[in-house]
Each structure stands twice: as C-alpha cells, then as structure tokens.
Amino acid sequence: SQIKFKPSYIELAVVADHGMFTKYNSNINTIRIVHEMVNTVDGFFRTITSFGEWRERDIIPRSCIMASTISKHNPQCIINQPI
C-alpha cells in the first residue's frame, strides 16, 4: 500500500552568526558548505511526496535494487552486508 501525504511546509532559517563564523577561522568556504548542505536537505524533502511500505512481501527484489543503485553509493552493499 502507499500512503499519500498532504502537502506540508517547513520554514527553515539557518544563521551563521559571528561567533560561528569566527569559530571556523572566518572561512567563507565553511559558510558555503553549510549553505550547500541546507539546499541538499531541502531538495530531499521536496521530492518526498509519498511513502510506500510492503508489509507482506518485497514487490521489487532487494538484490535488484542493490545491484543497480545502492551499491554505487553504499560500501556495505559492496561487501554484501545488510544495511
């Protein structure tokens, strides 16, 4: 079955205050990394519009998913260990 989510919104504000800026040696690249991380997380949440769960059985064999997708990014799959 698949659960459809009602659109919901989260307002997020991230502030790199002066204390944080000086803590990291006034390195503007550190601030840029924080900005990139926030944009990445925002991108994840924009794409999650539904969630499916398979209670009775796996509809897609897990080995197919791992072989084609996950193993590229997950070292645990490369060594054939459970996630």
UniProtKB/Swiss-Prot annotation:
Tissues in which the UniProt entry reports expression: Expressed by the venom gland.
GO annotations of cellular component type: extracellular region
Species of origin: Bothrops pauloensis
EC number: 3.4.24.-
Entry similarity comment: Belongs to the venom metalloproteinase (M12B) family. P-I subfamily.
Main location: secreted
Function: This protein is a zinc protease from snake venom that is devoid of significant myotoxic and hemorrhagic activities. It hydrolyzes the Aalpha-chain and more slowly the Bbeta-chain of fibrin and fibrinogen, without affecting the gamma-chains. It induces cell detachment and a apoptosis (anoikis) in endothelial cells.
UniProt KW Protease keyword: yes
GO terms for MF: metal ion binding; metalloendopeptidase activity; toxin activity
Record comment: activity regulation: Inhibited by EDTA.
Protein name: Snake venom metalloproteinase BnP1
Cofactor: Zn(2+)
Cofactor note: Binds 1 zinc ion per subunit.
